[in-house]
Design a protein with these regions (language model features):
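Hydrophobic faces of well-ordered beta-strands that scaffold small-molecule active sites
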Residues: 112, 149-154
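N-terminal accessory beta-strand-rich subdomains and adjacent acidic, glycine-rich linkers
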Residues: 1-140, 144
Length: 154
């Protein structure tokens, strides 16, 4: 997935971590060139999460423009923001091309992972709440009630 923005006046945000210290926020100014987050370990995880965001310089939890991008995929990924010589920004997310190849035979298809994009004019908090609502509604599997015969479970 790629999407272009007409300017580069944003901060770049991503999440990283380790065991027992997941989801640390890393926020840096967006610069000319490419800023990226990736996994080549065969999985996405708390080390590098397949999520990035572009934020207006004044954005915080309660106000400011935030564009969030989350790849719904648990394998190798590449998420990047590239600013060109005209100060336009291109955000790209997808399967990491490192060590990846897929030969499509005639009449075969390949479905790429989905990217869920969220815009908030009310800061990171609203973006986060929107993601939570979307994932609970669309991606959370429905749990069917189970009946257990406790009488025979002694």
């Amino acid at each position: 997935m790629s999407i272009d923005f007409n300017n580069s006046d944003y901060d770049f945000l991503h999440l990283h971590g380790a065991w027992a210290r997941e989801r640390h926020i890393e926020r840096t100014p967006l610069l000319i060139g490419t800023q990226s987050v990736e996994s080549r370990r065969g999985s996405s995880s708390h080390n590098q999460n397949p999520f990035i965001a572009l934020l207006s310089k004044d954005a915080n939890e309660e106000h400011g423009d935030v564009y969030g991008f989350n790849l719904v995929y648990s394998g190798n990924f590449l998420a990047q923001a590239e600013v060109d010589q005209y100060k336009t920004t291109r955000v790209s997310l997808g399967i990491n091309p490192f060590d990846f190849s897929w030969l499509l035979k005639p009449n075969e298809s390949f479905q790429t992972p989905e990217v869920v994009m969220v815009y908030s004019s009310n800061g990171l908090g609203e973006m986060s709440r929107t993601y939570h609502k979307l994932y609970r509604k669309r991606y959370k599997p429905s749990i069917k009630p189970r009946r257990t015969n406790r009488w025979t479970c002694r």
